């Protein structure tokens, strides 16, 4: 049986990614990470993408209420090995504990740009014109 060459994540990658996301969320909520910047910031983890071999987890995070996202991401990456160690009790079924990387989630900004474009007068005029022709 040949392996699939599609770039879409497998069901297992999605399931494990969701489990890792929940585990990281619990570690951060409990306050296990002793860093003033992380402790004082509300951090939303929107998605965790797993590598095909499940050895690397990329967590997309959005620090809420902080202007300097890069500093929070840097602090999280500085404590990534500690966080990885705290994932063990939550992910007992994993053969290997994945390395964790944190990245800034820009999807919300992209959604806002698309929304503002759709609400612009030029686009709404074109949309109104299309609906009048039907």
From Swiss-Prot:
A GO MF term: ribosomal small subunit binding
Pfam families from the UniProt entry: RBFA
A GO-annotated cellular component: cytosol
Annotated keywords: Cytoplasm, Ribosome biogenesis
Gene Ontology biological process terms in this record: maturation of SSU-rRNA
Localisation: Cytoplasm
NCBIfam families: PRK00521.2-5 (NF001802), rbfA (TIGR00082)
Protein family per UniProt: Belongs to the RbfA family.
Role this protein plays: One of several proteins that assist in the late maturation steps of the functional core of the 30S ribosomal subunit. Associates with free 30S ribosomal subunits (but not with 30S subunits that are part of 70S ribosomes or polysomes). Required for efficient processing of 16S rRNA. May interact with the 5'-terminal helix region of 16S rRNA.
Subunit structure: Monomer. Binds 30S ribosomal subunits, but not 50S ribosomal subunits or 70S ribosomes.
Protein name according to UniProt: Ribosome-binding factor A
Organism in which the protein naturally occurs: Sinorhizobium medicae (strain WSM419)
Lineage: Bacteria, Pseudomonadati, Pseudomonadota, Alphaproteobacteria, Hyphomicrobiales
Annotated gene: rbfA
């Amino acid at each position: 049986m040949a392996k699939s060459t599609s770039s879409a994540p497998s069901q297992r990658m999605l399931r494990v990614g969701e489990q890792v996301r929940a585990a990281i969320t619990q570690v951060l909520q409990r306050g296990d990470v002793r860093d003033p910047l992380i402790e004082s910031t509300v951090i939303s983890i929107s998605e965790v993408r797993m590598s095909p071999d499940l050895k690397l987890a990329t967590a997309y995070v959005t620090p809420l209420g902080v202007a300097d996202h890069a500093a929070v991401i840097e602090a999280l990456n500085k404590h990534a090995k500690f966080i990885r160690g705290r994932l063990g009790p939550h992910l007992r079924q994993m053969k290997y504990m994945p390395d964790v990387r944190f990245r800034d989630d820009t999807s919300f900004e992209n959604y806002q740009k698309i929304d503002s474009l759709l609400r612009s007068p030029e686009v709404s005029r074109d949309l109104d014109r299309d609906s009048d022709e039907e």
